[in-house]
Amino acid sequence: MIPAEQIATDLLTIGAVTLAPNHPFLWASGMQAPIYTDNRRTIAFPQVRTHIADGLASLIKHRYPTATVISGVATAGITHAALVADRLNLPMSYVRAKPKDHGKGKQIEGQMTASDQVVLIDDLISTGGSVLAAAKAVRKAGATVLGVVAIFSYELPDSVVNFQQAGLALTPLTTYSTLITVAQQQAKITAPEMASLRQWREDPWGWVSV
């Protein structure tokens, strides 16, 4: 298993994650956040891509040994799902945000049957909305969702509630808490910035930048 600290280091090193508690980012949700994540960058770095694929494959092999299909959440989860499915020698599928408006109107691409045991892969978990919508589509197709794995989770309170309500477990390779700890150890953030970053995770909507 690839250590969570290694994945966090990888994300920081390649600029997939940017920490800026003094100059917060505006998310699409309207939330002000001291962090911005673009895990799509990971596919451009072979060593990082390998760490992620190996880590996810190992996680699934040990946590979900009965998995019969690896399914990526479109679009960012597709590449990682393909790499993991190849390592585990399992079928792969992917789930769109909504059914196509032409052709056969498919939402799920690849082969999936009602007897399948599916593990969903996404690159990033904020509230969990995208991957939980994908899980709903898989369940509607008759298959069983064993759980969700991801590269990185913000550990936001809303995501904890949402996954509990959906009856699904989330297992990320690394987390916000681990990443900011690694960033402080590497002198990428100061002690006051660390305190601000912790406050944001506890109360993201009420957080004020330093």
UniProtKB/Swiss-Prot annotation:
One of its GO terms (molecular function) is magnesium ion binding. InterPro entries: OPRT, Or_phspho_trans_dom, PRibTrfase_dom, PRTase-like. Gene3D superfamilies: 3.40.50.2020. It catalyses: orotidine 5'-phosphate + diphosphate = orotate + 5-phospho-alpha-D-ribose 1-diphosphate. Keywords: Glycosyltransferase, Magnesium, Pyrimidine biosynthesis, Transferase. Orotate binds at S126. Pathway: Pyrimidine metabolism; UMP biosynthesis via de novo pathway; UMP from orotate: step 1/2. 5-phospho-alpha-D-ribose 1-diphosphate binds at R96, K100, H102, D122, D123, L124, I125, S126, T127, G128, G129, S130. It comes from the Bacteria. GO terms for biological process: 'de novo' UMP biosynthetic process; pyrimidine nucleobase biosynthetic process. The keyword Transferase applies. Pfam families: Pribosyltran (PF00156). CDD domains: PRTases_typeI. The keyword Glycosyltransferase applies. Its EC number is 2.4.2.10. Its cofactor is Mg(2+). Homodimer. Belongs to the purine/pyrimidine phosphoribosyltransferase family. PyrE subfamily. PANTHER family: OROTATE PHOSPHORIBOSYLTRANSFERASE, URIDINE 5'-MONOPHOSPHATE SYNTHASE. Catalyzes the transfer of a ribosyl phosphate group from 5-phosphoribose 1-diphosphate to orotate, leading to the formation of orotidine monophosphate (OMP). This is Orotate phosphoribosyltransferase. The gene is pyrE.
